[in-house]
Design a protein with these regions (language model features):
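Glycine-/small-residue-enriched transmembrane alpha-helix faces in small-molecule transporters
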Residues: 1-39, 147-176, 184, 197-198, ...
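Juxtamembrane helix-entry segments on the extracytoplasmic side of multipass membrane proteins
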Residues: 4-8, 31-39, 63-69, 141-166, ...
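Helix-helix packing/entry segments at the starts of transmembrane helices
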Residues: 12, 40, 79, 83, ...
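Cytoplasmic-side transmembrane-helix entry/capping segments in multi-pass membrane proteins
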Residues: 12, 66-74, 121-133, 181-190, ...
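Specific transmembrane alpha-helical segments of multi-pass solute transporters/efflux pumps
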Residues: 18, 22-23, 50, 54-102, ...
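Hydrophobic/aromatic residues within transmembrane alpha-helices
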Residues: 29, 37, 41, 89, ...
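Transmembrane alpha-helices of multi-pass small-molecule transport proteins
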Residues: 31-81, 108-109, 165-173, 187-206, ...
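Hydrophobic transmembrane alpha-helices of multi-pass small-molecule transport proteins
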Residues: 49, 112, 121-143, 254, ...
Length: 301
């Protein structure tokens, strides 16, 4: 492993672990109105991130108009879209099933890097993608379906899969940015743009509901979501992914379903079987192979 990439790899691994914990937090927040839950999350995160920018005296980023539009698109698709679809899906399916479904993210991320960004994957890179996908298949086989094949359960799984597709786009859109942006500024912009996008819908939901009405555990889950995955996770991911190829970054998303499943099992007292541990081993092997890949130049044309 290249020593100069040690920090980017560690940052992306930690970021994906925090993203995996959103499965637990989102399941706890599922009782809240969707946009109200997101409003609480992004409001807390935005205040913390803006305070950090002020304390650290980070200069305002100078970006082209096209880059500002791209950032808004990232916030809409990968932040608001992912959160809304995940919260809706977790209201219909189990946390363990949702964790397993996120196993589609490594393959989607790497393939988008190939077909959208024009990057090339070596045979080792394709092998890493295959291992990551196989790990998630094993996790799904080991877990089985906890909700049967009814329409509600399948609908929840479909919503979670749609959220995963949003996340895959989100993780790669920043590769389209022409100017370098400080990771802390990137996290702050994503959070504040997301807050602005979901605020009108949250106000409508609060008005229709006659004011806030949810448990303290759901509110604390929203605060955790804001401080750890949204604030710390955004910063870690942008710190790491800005220094490696999109395909390499995509491999690290194999940690999302692994951490999601293990944290769901720990929090909700769900059993973890030997097949799950085997799946974890394959996911880790995929990361080892992925980090050994040398970045390839974009395809000509």
């Amino acid at each position: 492993m290249n020593r100069k990439h040690l920090w980017p790899y560690a940052a992306m691994a930690l970021a994906m672990t925090t993203v995996g914990s959103t499965i637990v937090a989102s399941k706890m927040m599922a009782q809240m109105p969707i946009f109200v839950a997101m409003l609480a999350r992004f409001a807390v995160a935005s205040m913390v991130l803006i305070a950090l920018l002020w304390v650290l005296r980070k200069p305002w980023p100078r970006l082209l108009p096209a880059s500002w539009r791209l950032l808004v698109a990232q916030a809409f698709v990968g932040s608001v879209g992912y959160s809304a679809l995940l919260l809706l899906g977790l209201g219909l399916t189990s946390a363990a099933d949702a964790s397993v479904i996120t196993g589609a993210l490594p393959a989607l991320g790497a393939l988008l890097a190939v077909f959208v960004l024009g990057e090339r994957l070596s045979p080792a890179g394709w092998g890493a993608v295959a291992l990551a996908v196989l790990a998630m298949v094993l996790l799904q086989t080991g877990r089985g379906s906890s909700g049967g094949g009814d329409a509600t359960h399948l609908g929840g799984n479909a919503l979670v899969l749609a959220a995963v597709a949003c996340e895959a786009v989100f993780l790669l859109l920043n590769k389209r940015l022409r100017e370098p942006i400080d990771p802390l500024w990137m996290a702050a912009l994503m959070s504040t743009f997301s807050l602005a996008l979901c605020a009108p819908f949250a106000l409508v939901q609060l008005t229709l509901a006659g004011g806030p009405s949810f448990s303290s555990s759901a509110l604390w889950a929203a605060v955790y979501y804001a401080l750890v995955p949204t604030t710390l996770g955004f910063w870690l991911w942008y710190s790491g992914s800005s220094q490696v190829s999109g395909a390499q970054a995509g491999i690290f998303t194999a940690l999302l379903p692994v951490s999601g499943l293990l944290l769901s099992a720990a929090w909700f007292a769900e059993p973890v079987e030997p097949r799950h541990w085997f799946g974890v081993g394959l996911a880790v092997l995929a990361i080892v192979i992925g980090t050994a890949m040398k970045p390839s130049p974009p395809a000509a044309g």
